[in-house]
Swiss-Prot record:
The keyword Transmembrane applies. The chain crosses the membrane at residues 22-42, 55-75, 86-106, 108-128, 148-168, 176-196, 216-236, 256-276, 282-302, 306-326, 344-364, 367-387. It is a multi-pass membrane protein. The gene is nepI. It holds the Pfam family MFS_1. It is found in: Cell inner membrane. It comes from the Bacteria. This is Purine ribonucleoside efflux pump NepI. One of its GO terms (cellular component) is plasma membrane. GO terms for molecular function: antiporter activity; purine nucleoside transmembrane transporter activity.
Amino acid sequence: MSEFIAENRGADAITRPNWSAVFSVAFCVACLIIVEFLPVSLLTPMAQDLGISEGVAGQSVTVTAFVAMFASLFITQTIQATDRRNVVILFAVLLTLSCLLVSFANSFSLLLIGRACLGLALGGFWAMSASLTMRLVPPRTVPKALSVIFGAVSIALVIAAPLGSFLGELIGWRNVFNAAAVMGVLCIFWIIKSLPSLPGEPSHQKQNTFRLLQRPGVMAGMIAIFMSFAGQFAFFTYIRPVYMNLAGFSVDGLTLVLLSFGIASFIGTSLSSFILKRSVKLALAGAPLILAVSALVLTLWGSDKIVATGVAIIWGLTFALVPVGWSTWITRSLADQAEKAGSIQVAVIQLANTCGAAIGGYALDNIGLTSPLMFSGTLMLLTALLVTAKVKMKKS
């Protein structure tokens, strides 16, 4: 109880939201996401320039996710009492350094080192995002602030691949990463200007991160997070083969579907704060239930292009509630240990993304075209049931 009081005394004193700081965090998160996925659209020229296969070059994305998973788990144990403002500045420096190392890479090993630096920044920043947010705004404004941050994520996910592809043709892949390094420098200056001092956890309050899982409802919550994100990646990773073969979309048609998905996701994120103010638990249970029904509809009637497009829009709109909702759950139910809870959450999501994509791919190759949808829908239904039965939610 003393830890709760100590960590929230500063938060309780906040009467006016620091929106400049919130937007600086959102901008930094967006830059991290864009740089994370830049290689997806630049894979071919990167591979040709470095004299490696595209499959090997693709490991530049894998190593980032792998390092991010471990960074998220151990970052709070490492930084302890360090002022979080300085830690965030360090992450922005790592983002900039990563872009420069990749830009000047003349070997695959240097490329991986650069991408590993990004993984450290990505995992650490994501682990701290919820706890940072709740220290920048009053408690009643936390859902809105989180929706700003995840709105930036939605925009980044929509523009990362096409922006990288367009600029890569225009100025070359190395200069794309140089431009990203400039964004990193902007992050550094904006954070220095807007983010206040945020003292870390005193050493005498140090607590093992994994002890949080012993609290009532926390393990159930993390399992629900795992299943919902695994279900998402089992579906979304293979949306191209499913939509092109099941519904008969052309490449141009699929591009429009993905654009619609991205716009719907942004709208869903923007509306999430209004929904979460009414009931976080209802949102966390209702969203996966809607997604489970959507997966069933796509499995049964996905050959109709109108139905398939509608499902993509509903999916983007609905899943947008999930990351904002779970971050809100952490800020309310685990407010005294939000940073450590965020560490576990990020690691669980990274693992879920990997497992969901792997199992979905195996199902697609060995069972059938609609099998990733059935797997995804099953996970979403189980998530809804688990949240309803086991996940605890404290009122704000």
